[in-house]
């Protein structure tokens, strides 16, 4: 039975829990992560996430970093392991995802991760970088609201790195972000995905 895509973006997924272990293999890391039904990528780390982690620049060594829409935490845990002097926020509306991200960070000895729902992130907090495999399947309007809630919280000179499948609108999203006043660059294109670098226009 397939799980509706919207399940991933609800606070409490209705689908029953069925935990499983998935592997995240990168050149510098090899991790076993706990995933579950009702959380994005539950059958294995999503290809877009892998493209982002392999192609985006390394995270800043210090400061606050956000994994927006963290799922069970593959991006957040990787960022934390790559930048042990930084503090990584793993943010998601899905409470099951947040619990998994917290557990996976602990298992990976990434004590510099805080897994949280959006309302648990301090309002005045600003980020040195944002990394995200954003939930494009929620639809344009909810996606645009999500990005406009968080991208303005970048510090001056900081960047967000978004991975979006080309056939799911990476180029139209880049154009829309530019219309909102952001500076957008297509950083990489690989395996049907684009990595976008988004900065506040100077």
Question: Where do the PLM segments sit?
Answer:
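N-terminal auxiliary segments of SAM/dcSAM-dependent transferases
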Residues: 1-27, 37-42
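Conserved SAM-binding loop and adjacent beta-strand
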Residues: 35-54
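Short beta->alpha hinge that forms the Motif I/post-I loop of the SAM-binding pocket
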Residues: 92-95, 142, 165
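A short glycine-rich, Lys/Arg-flanked "PGG" loop and its adjoining helix->strand segment in the class I
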Residues: 144-156
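Conserved beta-strand signature within the Rossmann-like core of class I S-adenosyl-L-methionine
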Residues: 157-164
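Conserved class I S-adenosyl-L-methionine
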Residues: 165-182
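Core SAM-dependent methyltransferase catalytic element
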Residues: 189-202
């Amino acid at each position: 039975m397939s799980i509706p895509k919207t399940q991933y973006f609800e606070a409490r997924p209705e689908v029953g829990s069925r935990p499983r272990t998935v592997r995240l293999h990168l050149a510098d890391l090899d991790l076993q992560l706990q995933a579950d039904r009702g959380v994005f990528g539950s059958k294995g780390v999503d290809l877009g996430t892998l493209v982002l982690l392999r192609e985006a620049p390394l995270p800043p060594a210090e400061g606050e970093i956000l994994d927006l829409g963290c799922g069970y935490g593959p991006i957040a845990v990787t960022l934390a392991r790559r930048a042990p002097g930084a503090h990584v926020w793993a943010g998601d509306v899905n409470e099951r995802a947040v619990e998994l991200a917290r557990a996976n960070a602990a298992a990976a000895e990434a004590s510099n991760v805080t897994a949280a729902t959006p309302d648990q992130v301090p309002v005045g907090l600003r980020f040195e970088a944002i990394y995200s495999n954003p939930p494009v399947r929620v639809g344009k309007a909810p996606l645009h609201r999500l990005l406009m809630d968080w991208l303005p919280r970048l510090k001056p000179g900081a960047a967000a790195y978004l991975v979006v499948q080309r056939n799911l609108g990476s180029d139209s999203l880049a154009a829309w972000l530019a219309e909102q006043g952001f500076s957008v660059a297509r950083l990489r294109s690989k395996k049907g995905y684009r990595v976008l670098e988004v900065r506040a226009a100077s």
